[in-house]
Amino acid sequence: MTLPPLSHLDRLEAESIHILREVAAEFRAPVMLYSVGKDSSVLLHLLLKAFAPSRPPIPLLHIDTRWKFREMIAFRDRRAAETGVDLRVHINPDGVAQDVGPISHGAAVHTDIMKTQGLKQALEHGGFDAAIGGARRDEEKSRAKERVFSFRTARHRWDPKNQRPELWNLYNARTGPGESVRVFPLSNWTELDIWLYIYREKIPVVPLYFAAPRPVVERDGAWIMVDDARLPLRPGETPQLRSVRFRTLGCYPLTGAIDSDADTLEAVIAEMLVSTSSERQGRMIDHAPGASMEQKKLEGYF
């Protein structure tokens, strides 16, 4: 019997599903980080496929910084209700007590307290020994050298010089005392692969990825959306309606939009085919002094 050849997307899908099942089999208490972005949407779809028709044995964890786009939070809650997955939300109580935010405390402090420290708290409180994420190697140079099974110390730190070899599709899941693992099933996917798979599988994504007239101000070379009244306007700033969309999503004061008329999946894919810039160009935190992705990962960031 001759089987038809697998397409490029079929191979990526099969690899990711294999990794998800491997995590479920090898770890005591795995969890999947759900950031609500396009990669998380694909990962959730793969998780549902991997264990269908049963409910996935792996819960979802969202680290809420209190500054996500309102559409992201609404989409998160809607997808959790539609899929029936076990969604857990954690907000760093220390950050809430100090009222930490990107405006009052700056991008670096906000990201560290509300995201990095919040993530470490949630993993420790939940007793999770493996955290699945949607990071891809094509996103950023420090992620390009990370293993699929990325081992972290008891303090959640990543040591790029102390990782294990991965031969073919064989993964070493043995952890030492206090160690945990971050797992990246989408490591070998590209941004274009993600969008093509979303198109093929008809996966719902946050509407912010599609162009629409939105109120924005130009700040530090980026279009920042005025999502609510908490964003103070600087002298000379006046919100204007522009047709924009987002290639990446995070805390709204730290996420720049791009000018675009791509309001459909087909148009987004067509735009992707001719793009020459990084999808993370709109992440303001990546441009902050001393805030490289590798440094953040060394401190426990995903």
From Swiss-Prot:
SUPFAM superfamilies: Adenine nucleotide alpha hydrolases-like
Gene Ontology terms: biological process: hydrogen sulfide biosynthetic process; sulfate assimilation
This enzyme's EC code(s): 2.7.7.4
GO MF annotation list: ATP binding; sulfate adenylyltransferase (ATP) activity
Recorded catalytic activity of this chain's protein: sulfate + ATP + H(+) = adenosine 5'-phosphosulfate + diphosphate
This protein's pathway: Sulfur metabolism; hydrogen sulfide biosynthesis; sulfite from sulfate: step 1/3
Keywords on record: ATP-binding, Nucleotide-binding, Nucleotidyltransferase, Transferase
Top-level taxon of the source organism: Bacteria
One Pfam family per UniProt: PAPS_reduct
Function: With CysN forms the ATP sulfurylase (ATPS) that catalyzes the adenylation of sulfate producing adenosine 5'-phosphosulfate (APS) and diphosphate, the first enzymatic step in sulfur assimilation pathway. APS synthesis involves the formation of a high-energy phosphoric-sulfuric acid anhydride bond driven by GTP hydrolysis by CysN coupled to ATP hydrolysis by CysD.
Assembly description: Heterodimer composed of CysD, the smaller subunit, and CysN.
HAMAP family: Sulf_adenylyltr_sub2 (MF_00064)
Similarity remark: Belongs to the PAPS reductase family. CysD subfamily.
Protein name: Sulfate adenylyltransferase subunit 2
Lineage: Bacteria, Pseudomonadati, Pseudomonadota, Gammaproteobacteria, Lysobacterales
Gene behind the chain: cysD
